């Protein structure tokens, strides 16, 4: 189920406060956040977010194509280890 239109997109209140402070000051520093569920809004375009993936903060630069997606989509939580075929000839 999608979110109700009358509610609007979810963005953490403390994250919006940080964005508003950054825009008021005119700085372009990285904004550290643990809120992976926050939706990317048009006001976030051009900002860099350090999104926590459970181990470290991954830098995410927001572009106009990311609007409507969640911040957590751009900081993967799992590292993929490729399925390596064992070379049986090298064992002998």
Swiss-Prot record:
SUPFAM superfamilies: Ribosomal protein S19 (SSF54570). One of its GO terms (cellular component) is chloroplast. The keyword Ribonucleoprotein applies. GO terms for molecular function: rRNA binding; structural constituent of ribosome. It comes from the Eukaryota. GO terms for biological process: ribosomal small subunit assembly; translation. Its main location: plastid. The keyword Protease does not apply. It is found in: Plastid, Chloroplast. Keywords: Chloroplast, Plastid, Ribonucleoprotein, Ribosomal protein, RNA-binding, rRNA-binding. InterPro entries: Ribosomal_uS19, Ribosomal_uS19_bac-type, Ribosomal_uS19_CS, Ribosomal_uS19_SF. Signal peptide: none annotated. Protein S19 forms a complex with S13 that binds strongly to the 16S ribosomal RNA. Belongs to the universal ribosomal protein uS19 family. This is Small ribosomal subunit protein uS19c. The gene is rps19.
């Amino acid at each position: 189920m999608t979110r109700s239109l009358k509610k609007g997109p979810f963005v953490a209140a403390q994250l919006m406060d940080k964005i508003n402070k950054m825009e008021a000051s005119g700085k372009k520093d990285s904004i550290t956040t643990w809120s992976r569920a926050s939706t990317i809004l048009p006001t976030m375009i051009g900002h860099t977010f350090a999104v926590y993936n459970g181990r470290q903060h991954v830098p995410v630069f927001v572009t106009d194509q990311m609007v409507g997606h969640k911040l957590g989509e751009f900081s993967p939580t799992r590292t993929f280890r490729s399925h390596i075929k064992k070379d049986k000839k090298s064992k002998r």
